[in-house]
Amino acid sequence: MTPEELLAARDRVVPDVVAGGLRVLFCGINPSLMTAATGHHFAHPGNRFWPVLHRSGFTPRQLKPSEQDQLPGYGLGITNVVARATARADELEAEEFRAGGRVLSAKVEELGPLWLAVVGVTAYRTAFGERRARIGPQERTIGGARVWALPNPSGLNAHWTVATMADEYARLLAAVGPAGTPEPRPTRSPQGGSTTVTSTPNSQPGPSSSR
C-alpha cells in the first residue's frame, strides 16, 4: 500500500459487517486509512482487535481482516461511531461523535443486537454524553441493546496489552453467553447502503483510528 493510496482513502466510508439479531455488534471509533483503502475493518498492522477477539474466545481461530465477513456466522458484527476515515481519531470533531452516536442508536434499534460493544471508552463518552463512563458494562441501553465499553485495540493505546484486553473482552463474552447455530441471511448496511452477505444467529430474535 503506497502513501498515495492511503491518502486517497481519507474520508472514505467502509461498509459495516452486520446482520439482524447479532450477539455483539462491535463499534470502532472510525476507520483508519488502511481500513478505508482495503475495505477491511481493523486492518492496520498495529491494531490488536483480531488477535484479542480470538484470545478472548469470540472466534475459534484468529481471523484475518480480509475474513471479516465470517463474523456474522459467530453472531458478531462491526460498525463505527463515525463513518469517515482519517489517519488519526483526534482529527474528528466532538460534534461528529455526537452525530455518529445518533446514527448508531438508530442502527442498533434496526438491527437488534443483544450487546453493543464500543471499542474506545473516550469515543463512547463523547458520542453519548456519558462523561463518567468507564471500561465495562454500562447502565444504559442504546437502541434496546445492552452496552459494554471496551478498551481501544489500537497499537497507540499503550495502557492495555493483548492479554489484558483479551481478559476484558472475555468478560463481555461471559455476559453474552454461547453462540447459537447461524443460518445465512443477506442484509444491507443501514449506514453506507452497501450490501454485505452475512448470516443471522437463530438464537436471537429480530432482524482509532489506527484501525
Ranges and model annotations:
Residues 1-15, 19-20, 45, 88-101, ...:
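C-terminal capping/extension of enzyme domains
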Residues 35-95:
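Short, surface-exposed acidic-centric catalytic microdomains
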Residues 35-38, 125-129, 159-160:
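Short glycine-/acidic-enriched loop or helix-start segments at secondary-structure transitions
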Residues 73-132:
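Internal catalytic-core helix/loop-beta-alpha segment
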Residues 18, 23-29:
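Short, hydrophobic/glycine-enriched beta-strand segments
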Residues 13-19, 62-71, 107:
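Short amphipathic alpha-helices and their capping/turn segments at secondary-structure boundaries
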Residues 25-27, 119, 150:
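Short hydrophobic segments within beta-strands
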Residues 30-34, 83-86, 122-124, 153-156:
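Short, solvent-exposed loop/turn segments at secondary-structure junctions
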